[in-house]
Amino acid sequence: MPIIKSAIKRVKTTEKANAKNSSQLSKMRTAVKKFEKAKTAGADNVEQLFNEAVSAIDKAQSKGLIKANKAARDKSRMAARLAK
């Protein structure tokens, strides 16, 4: 455990940021999985789920949780999957 006041604060802020980042990444992964599952099942709302997944990916990328290249790659693969 840290003793210095600034170190205590850093631990708190790091834990808070970690929780927020984990939540955001989880939302992104869930949105992508929902799209994949709906596409496999042939659901009607695939287009809407695609848009939600792309939005979640863009949000994660803008917050620095994933790199720009990964975001582009994931969106490209999903778009190709949607077109099939």
UniProtKB/Swiss-Prot annotation:
* InterPro entries reported for this sequence: Ribosomal_bS20, Ribosomal_bS20_sf
State if RNA-binding is listed as a keyword. Answer: yes
For molecular function, the Gene Ontology terms on record are: small ribosomal subunit rRNA binding; structural constituent of ribosome
Q: Which UniProt keywords apply?
A: Ribonucleoprotein, Ribosomal protein, RNA-binding, rRNA-binding
Pfam families with a match to the protein in the record: Ribosomal_S20p
Picking any one GO biological process from the record gives: translation
**Quick check: keyword Cell cycle in the entry?**
no
One Gene Ontology cellular component term attached to this UniProt record is: cytosol
Which HAMAP family did the record assign? Ribosomal_bS20
Role played: Binds directly to 16S ribosomal RNA.
Q: Which family does it belong to?
A: Belongs to the bacterial ribosomal protein bS20 family.
Q: What is this protein called?
A: Small ribosomal subunit protein bS20
- Naturally occurring in which organism (per UniProt): Ligilactobacillus salivarius (strain UCC118) (Lactobacillus salivarius)
Q: What is the lineage of its organism?
A: Bacteria, Bacillati, Bacillota, Bacilli, Lactobacillales
